């Protein structure tokens, strides 16, 4: 922003106030409230106008230069806010804290008092219009204290607060799991990894991360003397949580959200999945971007926004708690066996609004009447579900049902107080039901009858003046006034009418008047209207207090409804898609019978194509095994690899799985090295990216890991690639001793199946027919002897000359492989590998005959009979 001090005598009082507020909020675009608009000035205006694609104007001068200005209307501000936030800006909102009349009491030149009431950032959003209903909006904080490090995260729109120990090497996988919108870090930290975070990064002062101050802030926030009842937190964990609370206090200007007591996630409590694996498996987001095509989109049958958020959380963080997995699967099994009960529950859940976020907005004093109506509707449906469920239910369902009751008094209060369809904003009034407050009803009657009297008064004035076009109108400047066209002005301004009608204003085409009785009526109407609005605001505050007094119970009910939604969604998915309950135990087994890929199967169904199910058994005599999979491109190796990883993930997320039978020993980690892409921004080739990811797997995978690797070593020379792939497989077998699927085109590696006890060969079957290859997509025991790359290239549409030349080269190379090394070298020396087969020569243009040439020269109309006869003899002679 351009410089300027408030003492500059060229600065108006309003601009001086703006400059002062702006100086207190550096790094944020300032939305400065002026009437019905938020205005922006100086550099803020230029930035906002470009980002929002709105007009940039000017307002006065500052230090001899024009002041850039732009603005957005209050009623549409949230849409503009969302655009700015998504483009990486932070926005400080300065509201008018008094009306102009109050300011004038302090003096004619007094400026309306304004204060920043909120700093809007990506991680601190609460409005429905700014949030994705089915996704969490996490704010994270990373803290390091000596040899300890921790990551804390909160979603202020739902009240969730969690923390975990997080050494720096684990930070990127944790951020990939949580997908936060904003990350808080200490400002002096070396942040070479910033570009990989994928969210807004906000540096804070080291004071914000002080662990001693953090402990005091947290105790005060939760009203306890010690945090020990919530867990034994390390200094780093306290530091991270304290930074979160400090930042929320800053951005919300003292109105802290309704956070639940912190949950400490233990290291190893969930399946470890790194960022590359999440991307390759497309768990919550497809490689093309967006949800469509991801595992999340394929399995999402939830009918509430909180249920959808819980589903994403479970898929992102599958548990390793065997007891919890069995409890969740038992609840899903119960509802698959009770289809009528399941449908009744889902029908009720469809009518449940997002109580979590409504409650958060109420706590932040950012709510409207519709948020109260959401609490009313959600609790009413909770009572209905609790009443319909049978007494005998699995433990998980029973615990959820217990939290749904006990809200009858609040529901009755909200039923009596609120109209059926409340308006969005409390300031508009009209949300308190008739009959709830007799005083309010009487005030409304006076207000509404006063408006009826206006109509009667207008009819009387028309009769007195004889002017049929006379109207009584209202605006915010004049209040109520009488308006006639300029053609009747002389009559109104002349006696006797001028004695009763007092001239107020003349505009183009109209003249405006008032009378004593109209002014008195206006006062009565305005008083009644203002009093009615004041009474409604009073009731709104009382209802807000009544709801927040029960916030803990309401929050538990909301979380229980989300749990029931997810259980019933998993049950519905299993019933419709014919999924089976997996057997999960503490063994090292991994036996999948007739497994399917949930996303690919769904896509094929749209085209009417059946999915070919396949078996997978990575248990050899009770010990982990590695399947070495060979076969052609396009046969389905990558799909087979991914589907088995997704089956393990779904099972530990508490879902049934797409298979006829599944026996899975608890999985601690899932690693995937599938697909290829370079990283130009960091100077990494495709092969380098592959090696980095493979190194991470070999260095981290434990004996409970599930690893899927596809074509390791393909990005370098053949023998280099084969050597790397060979050594990688041996390391997985000998050192990591984990369950693994290893797909390759290096057929030489199939010999390992006879040398390493835990390695077995498998291949994807194909059928050759009249020179074509037919993909059967069946995985069988055994090894492939070729990859059919030339046939796949022909299917891809390579030119026929290229395909023919490739066949020639392939035949020559394969023939050379069967001969001695010297003969093979001679063959390669003689073989022009990089010469394409010559195209067939173009047909030569036919030579013109003498007869044709002579005929072209003839002009028939110019020939006499004698000349024509002679010409025939000449042509005949040419033929001979």
UniProtKB/Swiss-Prot annotation:
InterPro entries in the record: DNA_mismatch_repair_MutS, DNA_mismatch_repair_MutS-lik_N, DNA_mismatch_repair_MutS/MSH, DNA_mismatch_repair_MutS_C, DNA_mismatch_repair_MutS_clamp, DNA_mismatch_repair_MutS_core, DNA_mismatch_repair_MutS_N, DNA_mismatch_repair_MutS_sf
Record's compositionally biased regions (Basic and acidic residues): 850-860
PROSITE patterns documented for this protein: DNA_MISMATCH_REPAIR_2
Cellular component terms per the entry's GO annotation: cytosol
GO biological process: mismatch repair
Pfam families: MutS_I, MutS_II, MutS_III, MutS_IV, MutS_V
SUPFAM superfamilies according to UniProt: DNA repair protein MutS, domain I, DNA repair protein MutS, domain II, DNA repair protein MutS, domain III, P-loop containing nucleoside triphosphate hydrolases
Annotated keywords: ATP-binding, DNA damage, DNA repair, DNA-binding, Nucleotide-binding
GO terms for MF: ATP binding; ATP-dependent DNA damage sensor activity; damaged DNA binding; mismatched DNA binding
UniProt binding sites for ATP: 631-638
Region listing for Disordered, in residue ranges: 835-860
Similarity remark: Belongs to the DNA mismatch repair MutS family.
Free-text function comment from the UniProt entry: This protein is involved in the repair of mismatches in DNA. It is possible that it carries out the mismatch recognition step. This protein has a weak ATPase activity.
Protein name: DNA mismatch repair protein MutS
Naturally occurring in which organism (per UniProt): Cereibacter sphaeroides (strain ATCC 17029 / ATH 2.4.9) (Rhodobacter sphaeroides)
Name of the gene: mutS
């Amino acid at each position: 922003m351009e410089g300027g001090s408030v003492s500059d005598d060229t600065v108006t009082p309003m601009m001086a106030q703006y400059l002062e507020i702006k100086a207190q909020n550096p790094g944020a675009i300032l939305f400065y409230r002026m009437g019905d608009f938020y205005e922006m000035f100086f550099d803020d205006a230029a930035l906002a106008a470009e980002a929002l694609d709105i007009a940039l104007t000017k307002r006065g001068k500052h230090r001899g230069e024009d002041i850039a200005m732009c603005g957005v209307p209050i009623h549409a501000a949230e849409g503009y806010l969302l655009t700015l936030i998504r483009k990486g800006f932070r926005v400080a909102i300065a509201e008018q804290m008094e009306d102009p009349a109050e300011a004038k009491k302090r003096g004619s030149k007094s400026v309306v008092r304004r204060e920043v009431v909120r700093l809007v950032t990506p991680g601190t959003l609460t409005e429905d219009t700014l949030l994705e209903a089915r996704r969490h909006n996490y704010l994270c904080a990373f803290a390091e204290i000596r040899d300890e490090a921790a990551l804390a995260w909160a979603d202020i729109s739902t009240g969730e607060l969690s923390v975990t120990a997080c050494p720096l090497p684990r930070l990127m996988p944790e951020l990939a799991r949580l997908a936060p919108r904003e990350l808080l870090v200490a400002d002096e930290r070396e942040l070479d990894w910033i570009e990989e975070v994928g969210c807004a990064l906000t540096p804070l002062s080291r004071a914000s991360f002080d662990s001693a101050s953090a402990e005091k802030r947290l105790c005060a926030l939760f009203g306890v003397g010690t945090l020990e009842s919530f867990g034994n937190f390390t200094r780093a964990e306290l530091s991270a949580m304290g930074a979160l609370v400090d930042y929320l206090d800053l951005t919300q200007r003292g109105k802290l959200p309704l956070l639940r007591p912190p949950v400490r996630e233990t290291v190893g409590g969930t399946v470890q999945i790194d960022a590359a694996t999440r991307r390759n498996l497309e768990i919550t987001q497809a490689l093309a971007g967006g949800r469509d095509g991801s595992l999340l989109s394929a399995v999402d049958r939830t009918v509430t926004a909180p249920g959808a958020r819980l589903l994403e959380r479970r898929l992102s963080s599958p548990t390793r708690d065997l007891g919890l997995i069995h409890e969740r699967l038992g609840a899903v099994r119960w509802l698959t066996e009770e289809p009528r009960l399941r449908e009744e529950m889902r029908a009720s859940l469809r009518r449940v609004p997002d109580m979590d976020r409504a409650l958060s907005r109420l706590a932040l004093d950012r709510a409207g009447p519709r948020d109260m109506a959401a609490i009313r509707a959600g609790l009413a449906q909770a009572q209905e579900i609790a009443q319909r469920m049978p007494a005998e239910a699995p433990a998980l369902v029973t615990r959820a049902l217990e939290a749904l009751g006990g809200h009858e008094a609040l529901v009755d209060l909200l039923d009596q107080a609120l109209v059926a369809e409340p308006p969005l904003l409390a300031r508009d009034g009209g949300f308190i039901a008739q009959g709830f407050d007799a005083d309010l009803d009487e005030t409304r009657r006076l207000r509404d009858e006063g408006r009826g009297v206006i109509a009667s008064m207008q009819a009387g004035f028309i009769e007195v003046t004889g002017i049929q076009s006379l109207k009584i109108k209202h605006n915010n400047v004049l209040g109520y006034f009488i308006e006639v066209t300029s053609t009747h002005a002389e009559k109104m301004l002349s006696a006797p009418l001028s004695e009763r009608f007092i001239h107020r204003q003349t505009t183009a085409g109209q003249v405006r008047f008032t009378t004593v009785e109209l002014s008195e009526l206006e006062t009565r109407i305005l008083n009644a209207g203002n009093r009615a609005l004041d009474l409604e605001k009073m009731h709104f505050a009382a209802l807000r207090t009544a709801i927040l007094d029960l916030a803990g119970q309401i929050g538990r009910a909301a979380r229980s409804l989300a749990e029931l939604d997810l259980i019933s969604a998993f049950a519905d998915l299993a019933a419709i898609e014919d999924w089976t309950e997996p057997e999960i135990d503490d063994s090292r087994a991994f036996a999948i019978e007739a497994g399917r890929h949930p996303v690919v199967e769904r896509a094929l169904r749209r085209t009417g194509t059946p999915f070919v199910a396949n078996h997978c058994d990575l248990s050899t005599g009770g010990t982990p095994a590695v399947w070495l999979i060979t076969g052609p491109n396009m046969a389905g190796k990558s799909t087979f690899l991914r589907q088995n990883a997704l089956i393990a993930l779904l099972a530990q997320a508490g879902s049934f799985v797409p298979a006829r039978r599944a026996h899975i020993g608890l999985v601690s980690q899932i690693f995937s090295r599938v697909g290829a892409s370079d990283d130009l921004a960091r100077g990494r080739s495709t092969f380098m990216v592959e090696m980095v990811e493979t190194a991470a797997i070999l260095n981290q995978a434990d004996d409970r890991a599930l690893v899927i690797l596809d074509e390791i070593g393909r990005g370098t020379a053949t023998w280099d690639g084969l050597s790397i792939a060979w050594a990688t497989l041996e390391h997985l077998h000998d050192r990591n001793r984990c369950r693994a699927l290893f797909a390759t085109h290096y057929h030489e590696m199939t010999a390992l199946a006879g040398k390493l006890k835990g390695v077995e060969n498998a291949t994807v079957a194909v059928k050759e027919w009249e020179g074509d290859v037919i993909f059967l997509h069946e995985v069988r025991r055994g090894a492939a002897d070729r990859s059919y790359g030339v046939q796949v290239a022909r299917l891809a549409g390579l030119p026929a000359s290229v395909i023919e030349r490739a066949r020639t080269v392939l035949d020559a190379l394969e023939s050379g492989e069967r001969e001695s090394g010297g003969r093979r070298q001679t063959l390669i020396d003689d073989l022009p590998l990089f010469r394409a087969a010559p195209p067939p020569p173009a047909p030569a243009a036919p030579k013109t005959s003498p007869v044709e040439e002579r005929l072209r020269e003839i002009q028939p109309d110019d020939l006499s009979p004698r000349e024509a006869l002679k010409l025939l003899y000449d042509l005949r002679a040419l033929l001979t």
